[in-house]
């Protein structure tokens, strides 16, 4: 059973995939989106679901530090609901607080340049989100 992890931003969606045993997450790609034009990357996500035989999707839910859900969190919830309807798959929301900061720290500790970090940060945040989900199931 493979699980897809998504870090949904305003301009990109970071994508990670689990191994078949559901133990580890690895980064796949970053999908460019344009919310204003209604381009959310659903076609590419659908392709990845088919390609990797995905059974479940985990979408990062950006909560405020006090646990409340703001406008960005509401947008992610709507994104997840649209995916659920489109793909007819189990879509789970996962608290992603500080996932981007954790990904940034991982990349800095690996001595990745600032330019390269900017290119892969969303994909790495998706890895952090998915690995957190896998570790707790």
Swiss-Prot record:
Gene3D superfamilies reported in the protein's UniProt record: YqgF/RNase H-like domain (3.30.420.140)
Sample GO molecular function, one term:
nuclease activity
Q: What is its main location?
A: cytoplasm
Task: Please list the disulfide bridges.
Answer: none
Q: What is its EC number?
A: 3.1.-.-
Enzyme class (EC, first level): hydrolase
Cellular location(s)? Cytoplasm
Task: Alphabetically list the UniProt keywords.
Answer: Cytoplasm, Hydrolase, Nuclease, Ribosome biogenesis
Please give the biological process terms from Gene Ontology that the record holds. rRNA 5'-end processing
Instruction: Report the domain of life of the source organism.
Output: Bacteria
GO cellular component terms, semicolon-separated: cytoplasm
Q: Which InterPro entries match?
A: RNaseH-like_sf, YqgF, YqgF/RNaseH-like_dom, YqgF/RNaseH-like_dom_sf
Function field: Could be a nuclease involved in processing of the 5'-end of pre-16S rRNA.
Family per record: Belongs to the YqgF nuclease family.
| Name used for this protein in its record | Putative pre-16S rRNA nuclease
Species of provenance? Bacillus cereus (strain ATCC 14579 / DSM 31 / CCUG 7414 / JCM 2152 / NBRC 15305 / NCIMB 9373 / NCTC 2599 / NRRL B-3711)
